[in-house]
From Swiss-Prot:
InterPro entries: Asp/Glu/hydantoin_racemase, Asp/Glu_race, Asp/Glu_racemase_AS_1, Glu_race. GO terms for molecular function: glutamate racemase activity. It catalyses: L-glutamate = D-glutamate. Pfam families: Asp_Glu_race. Pathway: Cell wall biogenesis; peptidoglycan biosynthesis. Substrate binds at residues 7-8, 39-40, 71-72, 195-196. The active site is at 70 (proton donor/acceptor), 194 (proton donor/acceptor). This is Glutamate racemase. Provides the (R)-glutamate required for cell wall biosynthesis. HAMAP family: Glu_racemase. Its EC number is 5.1.1.3. The gene is murI.
Length: 270
């Protein structure tokens, strides 16, 4: 059995790290489409085709279940994939829904009508493509009423993180938080709607202030996956070993990933 984890670059490693800790007995195959990163500035068609190609590569590795550990792909491609493309014997899950369930205090599969929730003012930090898709607002509207969402497209942050430039990433995060607070001075909650952003979570929290609850995805997705596999064990595919694949330069990506997670990670060419 093996589960696939896909991201346009290295951000999905934050999700991989959490799911590996939660499910140590499950092998995971990670696919980073580093050659085409970042996805956040691409159009929806482009993101759809790249995400389908990556998903097929993970199916070929024996992963019947693939997690799109990339909010841009989850937002811009997943709905279309589920409606038009994914065969019956495979599953592809996004990273948005576990986050929204946590925010709206719902259990998985609770399809009751939308209702009032405690949090009324939510700041969303995400890539330009995720913000443009409005997928977060759409999914939230299925579950909650009366929630005001102010979205901030965070241009440049993913690039800075992928390049290992922490000083630039921190400066960009602070400027994006400032820009959002001009439009929504007192958010109650903030969503880090990109799997790269947990690496900058302390900076987001500091810039937003201690009274703002910051939601980041990795642990929420790990719990959701554990729950899913307990209910549907048949989707733990027949792959047997963990591996890391990249469309980029394996040596360069391995070095950045090792820096990223602070443990040795070795990628091979996809």
């Amino acid at each position: 059995m093996a589960v696939g984890v896909f991201d346009s670059g290295l951000g999905g490693l934050t999700v991989l790290d959490a799911v590996q800790r939660r499910l140590p007995e499950v092998p995971f195959v990670y696919f980073g489409d580093n050659a085409h990163a970042p996805y956040g500035v691409r159009d929806a068609d482009d993101i759809f085709h790249l995400t389908c190609a990556a998903t097929e590569r993970l199916w070929a590795e024996g992963c019947d279940l693939v997690i799109l550990a990339c909010n841009t792909a989850s937002a811009a491609a997943l709905k279309r994939m589920q409606e038009t493309w994914i065969p019956k014997d495979k599953r592809v899950l996004g990273v948005f829904v576990p986050l929204i369930e946590a925010l709206t205090e719902r259990q998985w599969g609770d399809n009751s009508p939308p209702r009032e929730v405690a949090v009324k003012h939510v700041a969303l930090f995400a890539t330009p493509a995720t913000v443009a898709s409005r997928a977060f607002q759409r999914e939230l509207a299925f579950r909650a009423i009366g929630v005001d969402v102010e979205a901030q497209p965070c241009g440049g942050v993913v690039d800075a993180i992928e390049q290992g430039d922490e000083i630039l990433a921190e400066a960009l995060v602070r400027s994006h938080v400032e820009a959002l607070k001009r439009r929504m001075p007192h958010p109650q909650a903030a969503i880090l709607g990109c799997t790269h952003y947990p690496l900058m979570e302390p900076i987001f929290q500091e810039a937003l202030g201690p009274e703002v609850s910051v939601y980041s995805q990795a642990n929420l997705v790990a719990e959701s996956l554990a729950d899913y596999l307990a209910r549907k064990p048949e989707f733990a595919g027949d792959g047997t070993e963990s591996k890391f694949l990249t469309t980029g330069d394996p040596r360069s990506v391995s070095n950045k990933a090792t820096q990223f997670l602070r443990r040795r990670i070795t990628f091979e060419a996809a």
